[in-house]
Amino acid sequence: MPSDFASQSNSSQRVIASAAYPENRRGGVDLKRAFDLLLAMLLLPLVLPIIIVLWAMIRVSAGRHGTGFFSHARVGRRGVMFDCLKLRTMVPEADLGLPAILAHDPAARAEWERDVKLRNDPRVTRLGRVLRKTSLDELPQIFNVLAGDMSFVGPRPVPKDELERYGRAKYAYLSVRPGITGAWQVSGRNDVDYNARIAMDVEYARRRSFARDLGILARTPRVLLRRSGF
């Protein structure tokens, strides 16, 4: 449904990158990628109906001018840009309203400059708050996994301008595929400050293993349920 996507850039862009971290391969086979494909194919029949229902709810609540999906350019492995997919949680043209919010609210501006996000973002819709709290807005990223842009486990995907804040830590980020879940998501998420999150991404890239990925995947549902209040 191409016309239903709100997109902010072209996925054909690239950035210069040098990833000095080894890949997880055994006998020429990318085991992590093979596992991602297998898990995505198993989950897709379960996830797709949920995505369709949520997409319909977003379209109904937004009216004819709203879009159900949102895509934004993120930096992938080796610096390749890709369109990261989400269910839309903000009002239409939300980015156009951000400068006014930051200009009139010094506290919000300070929070944005520190964390590159707002904990209580006024642009998020009522339904969007529920989707974010439960992380259901990220379900469409299963298609990013199938396309090879993302993995189930890895660093949080970030835009190009935000990656510049990583300094030399960006090479750790660029050595792996971004993930739907990861060390940051299961270690406090909103309670973890920005620099600590970057440190987690570096540590994951250096010590990544199949066993660790399985551990993060196993912890993710429990963390989501606890954060959602169930």
Locations of regions flagged by a protein language model:
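N-terminal hydrophobic signal-anchor/signal peptide
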Residues: M1-V47, A110-E113, Y171, Y204-R208, ...
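Short, glycine-rich, amphipathic interfacial segments at transmembrane boundaries or analogous
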Residues: F5-A6, G68-P122, T181-A199
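A hydrophobic, helix-centered structural microdomain
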Residues: E23-L96, I216-F230
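An acidic site on a long C-lobe helix of protein kinase domains
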Residues: D30-R33, L46-P49, R123, S135-E138, ...
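Flexible glycine/proline-enriched surface loops and loop-helix/loop-strand junctions
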Residues: F35-L38, P122-V124, I198-D201
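Residue-level signal for short amphipathic helical patches enriched in basic/charged
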Residues: P45-L48, T134-D137, V153, R189, ...
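A short, structured surface patch at a secondary-structure boundary
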Residues: E111-V176, I216, T220, L224
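Cytosol-/stroma-facing membrane-proximal "stalk/adaptor" domains immediately downstream
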Residues: P155-I216, T220, L224-F230
